[in-house]
Amino acid sequence: VRAGILFAAPLLYRAGKARMAPPGGDVIGRRRVDAHFAGLTALGTEIAIDREMAFTASKGLQGANVFLPEASVTATEQTMLAAAVARGETVIRNAACEPHVNDLAELLAKMGADIIGIGTNVLTINGASQLTGATHKVVSDHTEAGSLIALAAATGGEVTVQDVDPEHYEMTKLVYRNLGIELEFGDRSITLPATQSRQMQPDPRGGIPVIDTGIWPQFPSDLMSVTIVLATQLTGTVLFFEKLYESRMYFVDRLIAMGANAVICDPHRVVVSGPARLQSIQLSSPDIRAGIALLGAALCARGTSVIRNIRLIDRGYENIEAKLRQLGAAIERHKMVTDE
């Protein structure tokens, strides 16, 4: 699991050292860890890499000025965790500011760390000699909620997702409006009405409209796959440009096998024209986001589809079949040897 690398900072604080295997995670492209190393090294950590990664902070963690080489979510969280217990002040520049990063910062602040700049790409953290316990409600998963909305829109359904912060979905609302899908925001909810135009808006300059991903608050890469499936069921043509990961688009060949009208231009770009009548298929989930997208495609398809390797979907979507059944999906989980 990729998030396992986040044990490094807490172990450095408690034991002065840590040793672990390189992180895993979805194979969606080159996912570097140098940003983690940049943050920890600046705060006084020595790092040695062989078959494992060895971290040592023999003199303890010391505050410093840190410029992350990329606005990585986990690298920002790693550096925040270390800075929260480091001596002195740490300034993190080019920090990620996704909702779950801000949520961790809020928790650390409750536990005693002094953090300024939450929600921005510059964080100033004055570490605490010791963190205390705190009560905290974890922020809702904007990717899970966004995926459910996309799947409901793809199947022509209606859904209200509750206990979410609509501010986290401003870019999604804008992108989906250009696809002919309107979302309605409540105080703590998002509603997808049943009546939609489902007609993609033309590009003002006469070209093919483009949906591209970027670092927060731009359109999130984690919603790209389900949005591609949505586009196969809408009227019009759109170019998807995945700027962050070079292997995110590889699942589209499965959609083409199901009958989608799509062209893979290169590892980063796909053109989709809709609507297409998808056919059922048997396939294996390649990663979390492609898996939930292919599950959505199966819901749109005629006939019964079988999706294997669902443990990857489970990593990002807990009890997904129960939630989809509540929305009217005909879906069942079966125990198979390949999923043991």
Where are these regions (language model features)?
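Short, structured segments at the rim of ligand-binding sites
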Residues: 1-340
